[in-house]
Amino acid sequence: DKTTHFSLHPGSEALEITLMSRHGVLPEADFYCPIPWEPLEIATPAALEAAIAEGSDALLDRIFELIVKELEYAAPGWSEAIGLRQLTPDSIADAWFADRLTHDPFQWAQRNLQEVERNKREHHTVPWRYAILRLHEAIETVVPQFNDADSRRFRQGLARVFIDNYAAIPPESIRRLLALHRAGILRILTLGEDYELQREPDRTLIVHHRQRCEFDVFIDARGQKALKTRDLPFPSLRQQLLACGDDIPDVGDDYTLQA
């Protein structure tokens, strides 16, 4: 029995954990795929360079056309089922999450975990997941070439698909989340786009959908700005990095600083 169970220590019965996000979905489990990654067939480096060479106007739409062709080549059945030909860089994220948003997130996580474990046993790669994974890395090189309008469109649409697919977590982490939920400890709170976060000395308040939630401990995992070298809390390392004078210092194969 691979089922993970969670039991509270005596005196910890009051423990409650809440995961919060705008859409209320859990990350999916890491999926089986070949490593090293196979090359893309349509969205090749040459094809991407040719799209860039046409200029920044409508670049995102040209790149998306390559993405559509790559997915149709790799996963024709999935592409037809999701209506890929009718989607745009702006609407693909809504189509990507549509099915998940109609299901309980923990039930979805349980089914996804079972699928991932079965595919791992059978060495089966889900073609559309694998194609999106490889496209993510390829398209990353194009993003700096987008104009301001396309950059905004990319972040609000297509980037959400890449991030969700890339941010899959180990199956064991999914098992632990499910165990915490079964134990009545873990829940998910869907905040939506319009919420307020108020920090107070002894608590954090979240206001959403005309509801008010209070938390004794709040961990902000939205992703903070990178620290500057001078902000590092390790004096000796900070001094050595500052002395080298570079934003990214030279390091050896064993990651020691080079003089």
Segments and roles (model prediction):
Residues 1-259:
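Flavin (primarily FAD) cofactor-binding/catalytic cores of flavoenzymes
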